[in-house]
C-alpha cells in the first residue's frame, strides 16, 4: 500500500496500491539477453536489484552472463501480455500485509487506485480486479462488497440499487487504474 487517507465524517478510507511485489508476486518476467544471445527471464523482484547493471555491466544471473535487454524485454508487461496477466492473477502468490489492506478496501467498498509500472490497458487492470472479486481470491468477498456498496448509497442519500453487477461495475469505475507505462511510458525507469 502506498498511501491511506481516512475521511472522518463517514469513516471512509481511500487507498493506493502498487501491483507487482506489493499485492502479488507475479510470475511475469522481464526478458534479458545473455552473452550467447539467449533470452533469459528475470523476475520483477530481481529486476529491482539488477536494473542499473543491465546493459552497463555484464553480470551472472541464473547461470548465464547477462549483457543487456532482450529484443522486447517488457512485452509481457504491456497490452501484448494482457491475457497472460489475466491468467497469472488466478494463482500468483499474495503479499500478506498489503493484500489484507486490499481485501479490506474492496470488501468495505472503499475507493482505491492501482499505480503500477505495468503497461497494460487500464481496463485490463480493472477487469483483473473484477475477476479476483468474482473468484473470491484471498479473502475478497463479493457479498460483503455489495453489502458495503448498498450501505454507502444509503448513507450518501443516493437512489437504492439492488443489481449487484451494476453496483460492482459502478464501484470499479470510481476506482482508478494508473499503469504508468501504458502507451508511451517506459517500464525500464517508470519513475522518470
Predicted regions and their residues:
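Alpha-helical substrate-recognition element adjacent to the catalytic core
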Residues: 3, 8-181
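Active-site-proximal specificity loops/subdomain of glycosyltransferases
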Residues: 184-188
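Nuclease catalytic cores that cleave nucleic-acid phosphodiester bonds
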Residues: 191-192
Amino acid at each position: 500500500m502506498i498511501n491511506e487517507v481516512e475521511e472522518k465524517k463517514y469513516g471512509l478510507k481511500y487507498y493506493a496500491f502498487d501491483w507487482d511485489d506489493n499485492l502479488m508476486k507475479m510470475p511475469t518476467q522481464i526478458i534479458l539477453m545473455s552473452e550467447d544471445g539467449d533470452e533469459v527471464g528475470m523476475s520483477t523482484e530481481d529486476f529491482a536489484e539488477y536494473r542499473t547493471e543491465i546493459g552497463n555491466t555484464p553480470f551472472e544471473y541464473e547461470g548465464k552472463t547477462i549483457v543487456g535487454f532482450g529484443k522486447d524485454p517488457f512485452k509481457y508487461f504491456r497490452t501484448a501480455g494482457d491475457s497472460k496477466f489475466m491468467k497469472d492473477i488466478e494463482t500468483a502468490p499474495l503479499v500478506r500485509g498489503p493484500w489484507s489492506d486490499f481485501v479490506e478496501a474492496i470488501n468495505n467498498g472503499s475507493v482505491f487506485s492501482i499505480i503500477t509500472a505495468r503497461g497494460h490497458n487500464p481496463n485490463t487492470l480493472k477487469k483483473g480486479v473484477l475477476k479476483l472479486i468474482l473468484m473470491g481470491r484471498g479473502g475478497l468477498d463479493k457479498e460483503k462488497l455489495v453489502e458495503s456498496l448498498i450501505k454507502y448509497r444509503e448513507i450518501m442519500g443516493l437512489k437504492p440499487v439492488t443489481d449487484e453487477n451494476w453496483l460492482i461495475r459502478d464501484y470499479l469505475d470510481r476506482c482508478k487504474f494508473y499503469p504508468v507505462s501504458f502507451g508511451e511510458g517506459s517500464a525500464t525507469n517508470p519513475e522518470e
